[in-house]
Design a protein with these regions (language model features):
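Acidic/aromatic-lined carbohydrate-recognition and catalytic surfaces
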Residues: 14-184
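Bacterial Sec-dependent N-terminal signal peptides
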Residues: 1-19
Length: 184
């Protein structure tokens, strides 16, 4: 009874951002309700230089497979969006532990290769999203390594964000906690 009635009432309400939060949407927000995204793991998509690892130039080379820019053809997937898994430098193949948020992993190419990819997407009206992992970093990220070095040299003193601002970016513990799955 009531659960179904509540669901029906909710379905009848306007569920736009403005209705939910009492604010108008900014003018420049794209309407992505009808966009089809193709998620790409660059590492395994297409290798253009024969090193066994996919790269941005390989993605550009095979972009016509995703969208050739011609609505009249039926030989592409017709996707009008690409969602790139992380492409920033990282010690792991999946790139979900970033070491530099402002760079392209060298195995994938250069910033110029990325610019070429973006230009090719723009020619085809393909929108691009990049998976940006900001809730954690690599244990090799300079912020983390500086915080660890600072804490190791601290001894029994109390850490100070004035001495090392990066200590507040992470949750450090002096003792190993039960159930902890990873030790750096």
């Amino acid at each position: 009874g009531t659960e179904s009635g509540a669901t029906d009432a909710l379905a009848q309400e306007e569920t736009s951002f403005g209705a939910l939060y009492g604010e108008a949407l900014p003018v420049d927000v794209p309407d992505d309700h009808y966009r089809t995204f193709y998620e790409v793991f660059v590492y395994s998509f297409y290798d253009s230089d024969g090193d066994g690892i996919g790269d941005l130039n390989g993605l550009v080379e095979k972009l016509d497979y995703i969208n050739d820019g011609d609505d009249a053809t039926t030989t592409d997937l017709g996707c009008n969006g690409i969602w790139l898994m992380p492409i920033m430098p990282s010690p792991t193949y999946h790139k979900y532990d970033v070491t530099d948020y402002m760079a392209i992993d060298a195995r994938y190419g250069t910033m110029e290769d990325f610019d070429r990819f973006m230009a090719a997407c723009e020619e085809r009206d393909i929108h691009v999203l990049i998976d940006l992992v900001i809730n954690h970093t690599s244990s090799k990220h300079p912020w983390f390594t500086q915080a660890v070095s600072y804490l190791q040299g601290l001894g029994d003193g109390e850490p100070s964000a004035e001495d090392c601002p990066y200590i507040d970016y992470y949750n450090f513990a002096k003792e190993k906690k039960a159930g902890s799955w990873y030790q750096v």
